[in-house]
Each structure stands twice: as C-alpha cells, then as structure tokens.
Amino acid sequence: MEKQKKSINIYILSDSVGDTGDQVAHAAAAQFLDVEFNFARHPFIHTISLLDSILNKAVREDAMVFSTFVNPELNQYAADFCNQNTLKYLDVLTPAVNLFAEKTNLAPENKPGRTHSLNAKYFDKISAMEFAVTYDDGKDPAGFLKADIVLLGVSRTSKTPLSLYLANKGYKVANLPLVPQTQIPDEIWQVDSNKIFGLTTTKEVLNNIRRQRMIAYGLNPESSYSNMDSINKELQSADELFKKIGCLVINTANKSIEETATIIMESLV
C-alpha cells in the first residue's frame, strides 16, 4: 500500500503579482518529493484588513507564508502576525532590497510591481513570443533570417517549448524539424552559424518518447517512426547536417528546457 504523502499549505502574499514569491516557494518545495504542497497565491494586497483576513485563514490551515511586500507597513504586519501566531514565515524580498540599499547608499522606491512595468523589455518579450508562434515548425523560412536564434532538430527534441522559453527571455526564435528525405530551406545556409543550434538526443530516449506518443494516439508503437534503425539514420543525418553548418550541437537527453536554454544563451554572449 502506497504511503500517503504529508500535505502542507503554502500562502504566497504580495502587494504586486507575487511571481517572485511563487517561484521561490516552488523551487524550495521541489526539494521535498515526499510532501504534497498546496500553493495559494494572494496578489495585490494593499490593505491591512485584507492582509489580516488572509493571515487568519493561514492560521486555520497551519500554512507556511511567503511574502514579497514592498510596502513596509504590510511587510511588518505580516512578520509580526506570523511571529505571534507561530506561523512559518519567509520575507523573500526585504533581505535582498536591504542588501542593495547598503551597497548603493540609496533608499528603495518601495513601489510594488516594478519588475512588471510596461517598458521596452516587456514589449520586446511580447514581440518575441509572437515571433516564436509565427515561425514555429518551419512554417515560414523567412523567419530564419530574422531570428536571433535558429533551432534545428529531429522531432521530439523540445524545439517548440524551448523556442517559447527563449522567447520569454526576449529572444526571437525560429525552429525547423529535420525530417528524413526533406530538403533544407535555402535560408538556413544564409544564417550565421553562431545563431544556429542543433538539438539531438540518444536513440534510446527518442525511441521511448515516440513509442509512448504512438500508444497515446492509439496507434501501433512498432512503426518506422519509432523503429531503432530509422531513428539511428535520422540522428546520423542530423549530425551530418550540423557538421556542414558548423553549429553548436546540444544533446537534450536528460536535460531540462531551462538547462538547454542556458547553454544557448551563454553561447550567444
């Protein structure tokens, strides 16, 4: 009989969106696989009365509390309340803000949502997301000439999710699936090879992914799509293309999207 996981509630409080606290809480919780965490984000808290109501609910649920208040009054109230009611509490933002204040000898703005200001970077990110969708899967070869990054790879090497992740970082990304016996668009040969990244994997990983995909669609997993010999030829053909282009090749087997994206971004510097 499977052992039931311990369940813990986590409240994320903010006078802005609460993304920062949410990311920190999830990152820390990921280190405890045997515990079931229930996350409840409470953004845009601007009054003591609303904060008090939420904190009292946290007491009833014996929740852990993460906060990213920039309003000193709200921040102090949350800290005092949690201390008095023995709630586990983490003020995520204040230590970092204080560190910057000490180093710069300047007072913080104490204005919530500064990281979400509608500035040029924000609009660049939106534009990059639209670009990634428009030029996904080699839909329009013209996109390769406009892109900051071009991803090439056989199917199931995470080209689309990687494109969207990089777009969220502000990069315009176009990707092309490498299909056997299909001609490579002329535009690829006109792109600076430093902007092109070849995505590969192991034949075992690709075989497993493709078999599971066929099963999910109710199809026979024993097909040319998932055949080991066919996969081996696909990967060899892709490797030969990468060598001709002279691009960086990344093996995505056992790598997260974030890890692959980091390698790409660092290579562009």
UniProtKB/Swiss-Prot annotation:
Any GO MF annotation of the entry: protein serine/threonine kinase activity
Domain of life: Bacteria
Keywords: Kinase, Nucleotide-binding, Serine/threonine-protein kinase, Transferase
InterPro entries, alphabetized: Kinase-pyrophosphorylase, PPDK_reg
EC numbers, comma separated: 2.7.11.32, 2.7.4.27
Annotated positions binding ADP: G153, V154, S155, R156, T157, S158, K159, T160
UniProt family annotation: Belongs to the pyruvate, phosphate/water dikinase regulatory protein family. PDRP subfamily.
Record-linked HAMAP family: PDRP
Protein name (Swiss-Prot/TrEMBL): Putative pyruvate, phosphate dikinase regulatory protein
Biological source species: Pediococcus pentosaceus (strain ATCC 25745 / CCUG 21536 / LMG 10740 / 183-1w)
